[in-house]
From Swiss-Prot:
Biased composition (Basic and acidic residues): 650-669
Protein name according to UniProt: Heat shock transcription factor
Post-translational modification: Exhibits temperature-dependent phosphorylation.
Keywords: Activator, DNA-binding, Nucleus, Phosphoprotein, Stress response, Transcription, Transcription regulation
Top-rank taxon: Eukaryota
Species this protein is from: Kluyveromyces lactis (strain ATCC 8585 / CBS 2359 / DSM 70799 / NBRC 1267 / NRRL Y-1140 / WM37) (Yeast)
Length: 677
């Protein structure tokens, strides 16, 4: 680098190559680097070969160019090197290739008029004394001198107050050894600490005072407790906070000790059960370094591969969760379906219950109507629709009730409440009644409406002669004793078949069945009458036709309460002076029957609309009054008395019994007109 006449101050220096260093011993003034005739640049200093031509110039030490004020960390650096770096130099410069040369003790910054010799070396005693304060400052034991602090320009004074710098090698020797605290902590942490129980057990076994209670075995591989009770009393309280031998054994097992079974244990030679011996492969006499391998065993769940430290497969859990969700949805769907089916079943049950109640009401009304039409014998008349037991019970209750009434009222018997089984053609259709059938049906079942019984107010003298022949056990009143002649006749009839006990006045089998079927077929208009007629007509005509023809054609008679003979045949018998109340009762009964028929037709139309839905077409077109009110003049009909041609009876017969089938409206209108008249 060539000479440069211009001198720049320290503040104006921007390029480190422009720094000029003196070589003739001149120092620095207060304003900066003093002017010099032959200054050298930084490059010349770094290349000492360029200065070999000048013989008058001393060779300074390269370490003197380092300003301690610019490199305060260089003294305490942990890893010093031969690199020079200042705040002015952006990058450090390696100085390994620089060859050291002798220089003056004052260094390149010494002043020319200084008393210090320029040939002083680093090995002089003065230099060594001068370096002591610097070493103290480097170690942090001293403070900078007051003289060095008095100069505000930051430069050292001349002479002995100047503190020269040390070489890099000496600085390495004087530097304090650096300790890596983080690395040392890591090494300390790797050292395994022994458990407190293991340390206590080691000191316990090796203590000579405890040799009587616990000691090493002969081989030194195990520890022996010769007397358990004394060990618990003498040793355990000194080392532990308890005196429980079971707890001590549990801790031994927890840290890997195992009980050693003695050869004599369990035999008859061993009388001492208090001796215990434990063994651990890392607990041996004289081998304390093995204690670091003794650790507390993990729990059984961890040893067996439990879920505490084991890795759980998340996919298995997700699959199981999806399966659970699917099953839950299926169960929810099944629950909804079951709930819906339950609701539907409840609705169907309620509907069926309502239908059952309505049908039961209709059946009850039908039974009441039939009972009102046929009277107390309705159970026998419509017996095909009932069970035989119920029919027997109803019939027996009728007879029993009327017999009790007749027995209580022997002085005045009501002829309307009398029931004659002999005169009733359907009395023995279902067989005779048994005593066990009595008293099983309440009275209200057959006493819904009283039956109309027509009576004869005059006594026939011709009928009294055959009274004893017509009377039987079924048609006499309870409480009256029959005459001796009648008792003999009854005994003779008991030996005969049951069908021979009928004494109904007909002239032939077919004629009898005409009268049997007429009250049923004409009243109900159903196949019930014809069924009985076809079923029993031929039977009676074949078996008992000849016998019944021998009987008289007159109707059956019966004694009254005052000796009066009453006729019980289903025919109207007129007298010389007919009673107007009789016709009024007959008219009332006919009106009631028509009202009942109309009510049943309305029920059937409401439940099952059919041909009678418009109200004009009758549902029972064959439902007429009994044919025995009509005088057809057939051979099967009994002869009517001479007074049957009375004008009132003829009018009743022509207007009521043989009128053509009319609509119910016309009948109702006719009823209203008759009632008004």
């Amino acid at each position: 680098m060539g000479h440069n006449d211009s001198v720049e101050t320290m503040d104006e220096i921007s390029n480190p190559n422009n720094i000029l260093l003196p070589h003739d011993g001149t120092g620095l003034d207060a304003t900066g680097i003093s002017g010099s005739q032959e200054p050298y640049g930084m490059v010349d200093v770094l290349n000492p070969d360029s200065l070999k031509d000048d013989s008058n110039v001393d060779e300074p030490l390269i370490e003197d160019i380092v300003n301690p004020s610019l490199d305060p960390e260089g003294v305490v650096s942990a890893e010093p090197s031969n690199e020079v770096g200042t705040p002015l130099l952006q990058q450090p410069i390696s100085l390994d290739h620089v060859i050291t040369r002798p220089a003056s003790a004052g260094g390149v910054y010494s002043i020319g008029n200084s008393s210090t010799s320029s040939a002083a070396k680093l090995s002089d005693g003065d230099l060594t004394n001068a370096t002591d304060p610097l070493l103290n400052n480097a170690h942090g034991h001293g403070q900078p001198s007051s003289e060095s602090q008095s100069h505000s320009n930051g430069y050292h004074k001349q002479g002995q107050s100047q503190q020269p710098l040390l070489s890099l090698n000496k600085r390495k020797l004087l530097a304090k050894a650096h300790v890596d605290k983080h690395h040392s902590k890591k090494k300390l942490s790797t050292t395994r600490a022994r458990p407190a129980f293991v340390n206590k057990l080691w000191s316990m076994v090796n203590d000579k005072s405890n040799e009587k209670f616990i000691h090493w075995s002969t081989s030194g591989e195990s520890i022996v407790v010769p007397n358990r009770e004394r060990f618990v009393q003498e040793v355990l309280p000194k080392y532990f906070k308890h005196s429980n031998f079971a707890s001590f054994v549990r801790q031994l097992n927890m840290y890997g000790w195992h009980k050693v079974q003695d050869v004599k244990s369990g035999s008859m030679l061993s009388n001492n059960d208090s001796r215990w011996e434990f063994e651990n492969e890392n607990f041996k006499r004289g081998k304390e370094y093995l204690l670091e391998n003794i650790v507390r065993q993990k729990s059984n769940t961890n040893i067996l591969g439990g879920t505490t430290n084991a890795e759980v497969d998340i996919h298995i859990l997700l699959n199981e969760l999806e399966t659970v969700k699917y099953n839950q949805l299926a169960i929810a769907e099944d629950l909804k379906r079951i709930t819906k089916d339950n609701e539907m079943l409840w609705k169907e049950n309620m509907m069926a219950r309502e239908r059952h109640q309505s049908q039961q009401q209709v059946l009850e009304k039908l039974l009441r109507f039939l009972s009102s039409v046929f009277g107390p014998n309705s159970a026998k008349t419509i017996g095909n629709g009932f069970q035989p037991d119920l029919i027997h019970e109803l019939s027996d209750m009728q007879v029993n009730h009327m017999s009790n009434n007749n027995h209580n009222n022997t002085g005045n018997i009501n002829p309307n409440a009398y029931h004659n089984e002999t005169d009733d053609p359907m009395a023995n259709v279902f067989g005779p009644l048994t005593p066990t059938d009595q008293g099983k049906v309440p009275l209200q079942d057959y006493k819904l409406r009283p039956r109309l019984l027509l009576k004869n107010r005059s006594m026939s003298s011709s009928s009294s002669s055959n009274l004893n022949q017509r009377q039987s056990p079924q048609n006499r009143i309870v409480g009256q004793s029959p005459p001796p002649q009648q008792q003999q006749q009854q005994q003779q009839q008991q030996g005969q078949p049951q069908g021979q006990q009928f004494s109904y006045p007909i002239q032939g089998g077919n004629q009898m069945m005409n009268q049997l079927g007429s009250p049923i077929g004409t009243q109900v208009g159903s196949p019930v009458g014809s069924q009985y007629g076809n079923q029993y007509g031929n039977q009676y005509s074949n078996q008992f036709g000849n016998q019944l023809q021998q009987q008289t054609s007159r109707p059956a008679l019966h004694h009254g309460s005052n000796g009066e003979i009453r006729e019980l045949t289903p025919s109207i018998v007129s007298s010389d002076s007919p009673d107007p109340a009789f016709f009024q009762d007959l008219q009332n009964n006919i009106d009631k029957q028509e009202e009942s028929i109309q009510e049943i037709q309305d029920w059937i139309t409401k439940l099952n609309p059919g041909p009678g839905e418009d109200g004009n077409t009758p549902i029972f077109p064959e439902l007429n009054m009994p044919s025995y009110f009509a005088n057809t003049g057939g051979s099967g009909q009994s002869e009517q008395p001479s007074d049957y041609g009375d004008s009132q009876i003829e009018e009743l017969r022509n207007s009521r019994l043989h009128e053509p089938d009319r609509s119910f409206e016309e009948k109702n209108n006719g009823q209203k007109r008759r009632r008004a008249a």
